[in-house]
């Protein structure tokens, strides 16, 4: 990345370390990868910290390309008014939550937000159906039939919907996730 103007200041690095679960090296790597997505004229530290990278470019990163929830991940972490791009700080937040050192509570909170497709604060039947379709694919050979989908969602709600209101709230989701030892290790993105 070259000259003295192309590195994050020690103060900014320290601030990002305090606010994320990332190490200094991970933050520097994240900044380098973010800058690679920018036009040449926006790659200075000052410009890169103000820049917004469109989702199409973020989604081209190999670390996200194969993730079935990639669009939702970008939407959840985007602070842009149109929810169609990520700033460097949005990108850092994303990487922080998906890092090995993020707490299980943080990971489950963001997983819940990613799976809450309609952003209403609960996982309802439609959210669960979309979740299953993301995981199984929407091809003819992998898509569940309507009856299979209904049975699966009924089973999920039977196991997870503690208050029996027909939806899964955050605490119910976190309760289920707490019984899944592989969740934290599988909910990660490494640059």
From Swiss-Prot:
Main localization, broad class: membrane
Domain of life: Eukaryota
Pfam families on file: EF-hand_7
Protein's name in the database: Calcium and integrin-binding protein 1
Disease: Epidermodysplasia verruciformis 3: A form of epidermodysplasia verruciformis, a rare genodermatosis associated with a high risk of skin carcinoma that results from an abnormal susceptibility to infection by specific human papillomaviruses, including the oncogenic HPV5. Infection leads to the early development of disseminated flat wart-like and pityriasis versicolor-like skin lesions. Cutaneous Bowen's carcinomas in situ and invasive squamous cell carcinomas develop in about half of the patients, mainly on sun-exposed skin areas. EV3 inheritance is autosomal recessive.
Subcellular location as annotated: Membrane; Cell membrane, Sarcolemma; Cell membrane; Apical cell membrane
Result of altering residue 115 to A: Loss of binding to ITGA2B
Domain EF-hand: residue ranges: 103-138, 148-183
